[in-house]
Amino acid sequence: MILLPCNQIGWLVNENKKFFGNKSDVPIRDKRRKNTMAKKTRAERNFKFETLQLHVGQEQPDPVTDARAVPIYQTSSYVFRNCEHAAARFGLTDAGNIYGRLTNPTEDVFEKRIAALEGGVAALAVASGAAAATYVFQNLAHAGDHIVAAKNIYGGTYNLLAHTLPEYGVTATFVDPFNYEEVENAIQENTKAIHVETLGNPNSDVVDIEKLASIAHAHKIPLVVDNTFATPYLVRPIEYGADIVFHSATKFIGGHGTTIGGVIIDSGNFDWEASGKFPSLVEPNPSYHGVSFVKAAGKAAFVTKIRAILLRDTGATISPFHAFIFLQGLETLSLRVERHVQNALKVVEYLNNHPLVEKVNHPSVSDDPEQQRLYKKYFPNGGGSIFTFEIKGGAEAAKKFIDNLELFSLLANVADVKSLVIHPASTTHSQLNDEELADQGIKQNTIRLSIGTENIDDIIEDLDEAFKTLQE
């Protein structure tokens, strides 16, 4: 069995703070410094998002080769200097890499960078967004426990909570995330988390993270937020009280539809010990010689336990190459997301005024005053490049429209630089029954769009040409 040393657990926490630390730590002012004209250190400079996405985790060139780009450390394992060194690694007295299933230097840079961008203390990259969601809930809930989740979440996460985890004794109650009384009433003594998405899937409805966090914390449980559709460039849920954030990195982080991966970010703010509901994080773990993750890893206890236990035993490890691709994606995240949003808002306006469209499901044109308020609060610069609209003519018209698009690709992914389209009821959400489809706001005439970064005139022309075929 491969074990993660206790001091390596602490190292995982400390490494995340070497460059910029948390947002609350930046800039750090040394009040003892008398010379006010002295050059600021990196930690004292209040670097913005666009700078963080390029530099966190690799502040200096590679120490071995002087390469400025992050190297791909394509290795399964690491050499020990001698038997004594190997024993020290396994014996919890020397920090460092042991085996590629647990840690890798390329992955480490990606984890530091996304943690900094989200404002967390630590992160863990894994093989897929589905693995990220699964690990989060497995780390929180065990047989006999319960999760409260919003109805308007990704279909894969819905199936995980509704069908897969119940086979292991973990149940879920799905609620309207805008009915706070319903959310409160769904919480039981054995509830271990509330889960929502920043932007609902697939209609991009905006949840009130701050309100839901206050409900969760009143019951001494964490708020878990899937921030895939928003990205930390538009919203940082931790700033509004979220405790755990995760992403399908396949989407905006990668951005080009080439690479599968996921990532979990630990805010470091939830007090697992004071809650009294999470003994596996607090009490001694027998597979690590009685280590308590809260005591050993401090604020990074949550993701450290996933790495040390779940990743060790179930192995949904991200590859170094995929971590490298995601680092490339992060370097242009702000630029791409700005263009995605700019294009999407113009498409929303176009569709909202089209005679063959019954309704556009996007918060910017919602007739719900609460949605308008939340959209302005959480997305002051706009957001929601993945959304749906309902076309006149039912399912037949929806499918004909999709089949006549040329620029849009018909596929199951979203958040690609290329514009994408799909008919959710017959594909991505086809495993849901009629009631579940209604809960998620999906009808037979619903079409989901993921607006890319092409020239906006070309995007709208493609939509216009497809609409013309319905009038023939």
What are these regions (language model features)?
Residues 18, 23-36:
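Short, Lys/Arg-enriched N-terminal segments with co-localized hydrophobic residues
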Residues 42-44, 60-61, 123-354, 361:
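Conserved PLP-enzyme active-site core in the AAT-like
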Residues 337, 345, 349-352, 356-447, ...:
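Conserved C-terminal alpha-helix-loop-beta "cap" of PLP-dependent enzymes
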Residues 38-73, 264:
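Short conserved active-site loop signatures built around small residues
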Residues 22, 38-39, 121, 162, ...:
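PLP-dependent enzyme catalytic core of the Aspartate aminotransferase-like
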Residues 82-131, 156-163:
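Conserved N-terminal alpha-helix of the aminotransferase class I/II PLP-enzyme fold
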